[in-house]
Amino acid sequence: MSESNIVNILVTGSNGQLGSHIRRCSKQSRHNYFYTDVDELDITRYADVQQFVHSHQIDCIINCAAYVNVDQAETDEENADILNHAAVENMASIMADNGGILIHISTDYVFGGNKNNTPCNEDEPTNPTGAYGRTKLAGEQSILASKCRHIIIRTSWLYSEFGKNFCKTMLNLTSTKPSINVVFDQVGTPTYAGDLAEAICTIVEKGLDKGNEGLYHYSNEGVCSWYDFAKEIAQQAHHNSCDIRPCHSNEFPSPVKRPSYSVLDKTKFKQTFNLTVPYWTDSLAVCLSRLGNLETHN
């Protein structure tokens, strides 16, 4: 799959945050993209995926599908595992058989939180503290076990104009509530889905060389808490009437312990693919601008 070859690419979970952005940024691609979600292709059914891959001569799968409800996964781990692990194992096995490549999206939740408050690199020991992280890690491990060609990208705090996410929730709350409490003791980096999608599309356009396969980390540049993120959202959106107050995580009881520090080290990604990663506040401005345009045209 060199730069000159035309390849057939299957995007699963194409109606989600990342999939929607890949649909947008791949419009000018010379490659052939096939976009599916659960209504078009049930990735938990091996035979269905195998038939789709064979009939459309798929060279690359970009798997954006996932069970992402972190809290619900604690009482629904079986279904979380089906989507985050078993379905991934299916795709990895199929791509191993046909020699194609699987680009898979994983998460910072495979880590329990770095107690040294230093960015996590790809070699950092994993230690998921909940069902969501466990099932996502199992998905990663199934890819490695399959020996298929792969690029696994762990990301964090994904948000966008599409779907439900922290940014859109904060926009709603800060425009309707006199005050809100947001946790300050969970630190990481937001990732604008548009940036990650552009990075993935650029990797595909440059050519899926065997030397670039492996495990990578990607988020926007910078570090913040959820409280910092909320404050920046309100400031950029000019929602100045809402009093945003910092609070401890234990003030929001949750069935799963979230990582206290999960900043991802992106050095390997940037060096391998020679890509610049935008700072998180700049990307937030892009997202808010696009959200404004979407609201104007709806």
Language model regions located:
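N-terminal Rossmann NAD(P)H-binding glycine-rich loop of SDR-like oxidoreductase domains
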Residues: V7-C25
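Adenosine-cofactor binding site in Rossmann-like domains, unifying the SAM/SAH pocket
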Residues: K27-V49
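NAD(P)H-binding glycine-rich loop region in Rossmannoid oxidoreductase-like domains
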Residues: Y46-H85
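NAD(P)-cofactor binding segment of oxidoreductase domains
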Residues: T75-I103
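Catalytic helix-loop patch of NAD(P)-dependent Rossmann-fold dehydrogenases
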Residues: I82, A87-N90, V110-I153, L158
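NAD(P)-dependent short-chain dehydrogenase/reductase
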Residues: Q141-G188, A193-T202
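Mid/C-terminal beta-alpha module of Rossmann-like enzyme folds, strongest
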Residues: A199, K206-P253
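Conserved C-terminal active-site "lid" loop/helix of NAD(P)H-dependent oxidoreductases
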Residues: L215, S225-K231, H248-C287, N298
